[in-house]
């Protein structure tokens, strides 16, 4: 079969026959690339179970030579894609039936070629938790993000993201391309959430500092992290870090910019140029093509390639959908094969399990774009213009590009598991006297890991001057469930007259009386006694009043924003962005605590 026949397209039956005939009597392949391509890509056109049935039928009707070639093909299929046989029980059972049928007919030589029982378990590829054995006691500063060596932080981020990347299978890419979202695709959904989590965490770590000098120091540290990521050839996390540093919530901080050195600016500009989307990410593609050894692709770029191919080229070469478009199959295979080959490489880093637990919890604490931007405004308020009545349009995130709509909230059960592990790690590393409690002095070290952690006495529920494991776990779980893993607002309380019984959200007792005996938040509507106000642990979640340009109510869809840098020129670390006019809000002031 020459190349012209392939260009015209082939039916599935023709391709199956071609794959079988690619094996000689000694089991050697004449066209291994084509066979591997079809075995990887076949779920795009036919379920794996149906392919197994076709092979069984051909084995039943064929002669001894053809049966042996079929068994060689099945053997090659299992060796190249073992996870498919473990994670698809129906497929595994059909191959066992084929093996038993061969044995029953006395074809033991052919039957022995099929060894499905040796396939290891790949259940870990469908799990979205970050698991690891507990390590020994390490130096305390290894868990302090303010003092953590940038190279060490880059290595741990690489370990965390690559572990998530290694779980992605062909079926995940296929589902994403077909549906344009991650519905029913938790592994890819988790990976994208982690990508966005790194970007948001960087913004929050910068904004957690109260002075421009401190924020500039954090930015410098993350630029150094980005440099190390480039050395590791980890382009995916590099893109997330660069996206976080170039987000509008950071780029608008002009006072902070003035404290960033020209050297740091130059390094950051070079990273932005590398990841620019100009000429379809040409600079990134050239750099990635020269990589040797471990390399972690910027998955967002390659997913865009898959989406573009799927939209531009048809799956089938005929209207009846019987002839496969081989040209499209080859191009899609090239993209996916490059990703799967990268998954086979182990990152040259060693990770501390305790630090991974802390990072996992930190990256899972979701905030909205609006909340982060409001915190940015709190750090450096807008400069008022002379035109007080006119409002400038909101500034977009300059180097970020919204390109995928996917979305999900963090899994509360998994988050609770991470919280429990994190608390164990904190006590093992920061409970210096080993008394099972965190003192106020030890708490200051813990707080360096969580800049939005509330005050000591709010976690110390029994007010005995020390925090137990139960109290810390309870706090994080309460914050996770009540606040939905989001930062809140300070309540804007006003005295109210209640004409019917209302419960206090702190103590649970009724607020009695008609002469302004209670308080009610103007923003979220929560109620409490006056004397309970300062003890209220529930933060304000402002009720949405957002409407579209058409005046319709806008509900947040279920989507992730997997963001990639755009093409743009820069002479400084951040562009000169035009600020919006301040909006008068009487509902509340943004609070930067968890």
Swiss-Prot record:
What the entry lists under Pfam families is as follows:
C1_1 (PF00130), EF-hand_1 (PF00036), EF-hand_5 (PF13202), RasGEF (PF00617)
Write out the annotated subcellular location: Cytoplasm, Cytosol; Cell membrane; Synapse, Synaptosome
Please list the residue ranges annotated as the Ras-GEF domain: 149-382
Amino acid composition bias (Acidic residues), ranges on this chain: 582-594
What SMART domains does the database record attribute to this sequence?
Answer: C1, EFh, RasGEF, RasGEFN
The UniProt keyword set, sorted, is: Calcium, Cell membrane, Cytoplasm, Guanine-nucleotide releasing factor, Membrane, Metal-binding, Repeat, Synapse, Synaptosome, Zinc, Zinc-finger
Region annotated Disordered sits at 377-402, 573-594
Q: What Gene Ontology terms describe what this protein does at the molecular function level? A: calcium ion binding; guanyl-nucleotide exchange factor activity; zinc ion binding
* Span of domain N-terminal Ras-GEF: 3-121
Please state every residue range assigned to the domain named EF-hand: 418-453, 447-482
- CDD domains, A to Z: C1_RASGRP2, EFh, RasGEF, REM
Q: Which family does it belong to?
A: Belongs to the RASGRP family.
The name under which this protein is listed is RAS guanyl-releasing protein 2-A
Organism in which the protein naturally occurs: Xenopus laevis (African clawed frog)
Q: Which gene encodes it?
A: rasgrp2-a
């Amino acid at each position: 079969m020459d190349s012209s026949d392939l260009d015209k397209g082939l039916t599935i039956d023709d391709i199956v026959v071609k794959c079988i005939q690619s094996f000689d009597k000694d089991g050697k392949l004449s066209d291994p690339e084509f066979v591997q391509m079809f075995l990887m890509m076949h779920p795009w056109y036919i379920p794996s179970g149906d392919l197994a049935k076709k092979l069984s039928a051909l084995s039943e009707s064929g002669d001894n030579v053809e049966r042996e070639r079929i068994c060689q093909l099945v053997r090659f299929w299992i060796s190249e894609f073992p996870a498919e046989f473990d994670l698809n029980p129906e497929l595994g059972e059909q191959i066992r039936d084929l093996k038993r049928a061969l044995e029953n007919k006395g074809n033991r030589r052919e039957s022995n070629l099929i060894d499905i029982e040796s396939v290891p378990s790949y259940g870990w590829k469908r799990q979205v938790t970050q698991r690891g054995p507990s390590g020994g006691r390490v130096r305390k500063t290894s868990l302090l993000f303010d003092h953590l060596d940038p190279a060490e932080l880059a290595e741990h981020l690489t370990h965390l993201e690559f572990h998530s990347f290694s779980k992605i299978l062909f079926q995940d890419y296929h589902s994403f391309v077909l549906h344009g979202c991650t519905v029913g695709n938790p592994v890819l959904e988790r990976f994208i959430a982690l990508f966005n989590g790194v970007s948001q965490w960087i913004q929050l770590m910068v904004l957690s500092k109260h002075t421009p000098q401190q924020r500039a120091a954090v930015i410098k540290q993350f630029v150094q992290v980005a440099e190390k990521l480039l050395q590791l050839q980890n382009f995916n996390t590099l893109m997330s870090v660069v996206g976080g540093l170039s987000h509008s919530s950071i780029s608008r901080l002009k006072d902070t910019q003035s404290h960033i050195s020209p050297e740091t600016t130059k390094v950051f500009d070079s990273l932005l140029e590398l990841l620019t989307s100009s000429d379809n990410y040409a600079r990134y593609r050239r750099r990635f093509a020269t990589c040797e050894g471990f390399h972690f692709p910027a998955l967002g770029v390659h997913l865009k390639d898959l989406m573009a191919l799927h939209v531009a080229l048809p799956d089938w070469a005929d209207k009846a959908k019987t002839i496969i478009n081989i040209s499209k199959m080859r191009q899609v295979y090239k993209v996916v094969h490059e990703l799967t080959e990268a998954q086979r490489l182990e990152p040259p880093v060693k990770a501390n399990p305790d630090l991974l637990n802390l990072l996992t919890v930190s990256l899972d604490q979701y905030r909205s774009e609006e909340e982060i931007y409001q915190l940015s405004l709190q750090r450096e308020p807008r400069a008022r213009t002379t035109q007080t009545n006119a409002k400038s349009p909101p500034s977009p995130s300059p180097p970020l590009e919204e390109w995928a709509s996917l979305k999900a909230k963090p899994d509360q059960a998994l988050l609770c598991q991470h919280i429990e592990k994190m608390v164990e790690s904190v006590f093992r590393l920061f409970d210096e006297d080993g008394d099972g409690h965190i003192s106020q002095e030890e708490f200051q070290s813990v707080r360096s890991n969580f800049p939005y952690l509330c005050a000591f006495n709010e976690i110390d529920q029994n007010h005995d001057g020390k925090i137990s494991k139960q109290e810390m776990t309870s706090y994080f779980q309460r914050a996770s469930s009540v606040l939905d893993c989001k930062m809140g607002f300070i309540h804007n309380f006003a005295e109210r007259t209640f004409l019917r019984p209302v419960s206090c959200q702190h103590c649970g007792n009724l607020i009695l009386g008609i002469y302004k005996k209670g308080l009610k938040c103007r923003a979220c509507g929560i109620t409490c006694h006056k004397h309970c106000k300062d003890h209220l642990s529930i933060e304000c979640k402002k009720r949405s009043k957002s409407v579209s340009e058409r005046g319709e109510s806008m509900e947040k869809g279920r989507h992730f924003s997997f963001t990639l840098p755009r093409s743009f020129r820069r002479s400084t670390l951040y562009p000169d962005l035009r600020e919006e006019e301040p909006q008068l809000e009487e509902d509340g002031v943004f609070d930067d605590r968890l």
